[in-house]
Amino acid sequence: MPFLSINLVFERLNMEKYDIVMVFPAMGKTVVSEEDSRFVDCDTFKYHYRIPNKLSHLPIDKLKGADSLIPINHWEDTFIESLEHCSGVPLVNTNILIYNKLVELGKRVLVVLPLKKDFDLVMQRIRDRGGIDYDDSWVSWFENLYSEFGRANVIEYIGANELSERLKGWKDYGYL
């Protein structure tokens, strides 16, 4: 049965070969990259911020949202350049600026967003791991991100817990 559903997804999307997969936050890209070496979790965090020495001992999930991080100007170009040297299929968090630059460069980007019914579940995961407080401004930022990507060229809406299975299937069938 999973074989049939994967083929239907390919047919519906008229899938071609994609260079990069952009995934909505908290859908499991880190887990997938840890399970399967064909995928690389390309986190923008280390390109986007300079970490002060006093925080350098903390793991990345504890650093996100820290007040003393130092933003890096024009980090996007360095990040995009780093994708060229990836040893697998790059999995990137959704970012409309990065998406537009990649498309401009001729990269084929598949955008993966949660189904509307799973949006609240994904938001709860982000809150649970300390990524955001339950604050209207953060929630609306993610809702805006969701709607911005609703206009992407190739988009796939999947359940919040389906990323691993879908990515592996797409890779096995030659679409990534």
Where are each of the predicted segments found?
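Short, Lys/Arg-enriched N-terminal segments with co-localized hydrophobic residues
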Residues: 2-14
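Glycine-rich phosphate-binding P-loop
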Residues: 18-36
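Short, polar loop motifs at secondary-structure junctions
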Residues: 26-27, 94-98
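Conserved substrate/cofactor phosphate-moiety recognition/catalytic segment
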Residues: 34-83
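Short, charged, surface-exposed secondary-structure boundary motifs
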Residues: 49-55, 118-127, 167
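Structural recognition of the conserved hydrophobic beta-strand(s) that form the central parallel beta-sheet
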Residues: 88-94
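Conserved phosphate-donor/acceptor-positioning beta-strand/loop module used by diverse small-molecule
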Residues: 93, 105-125
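Small-molecule kinase domains that catalyze NTP-dependent phosphoryl transfer to phosphate-bearing small molecules
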Residues: 128-176
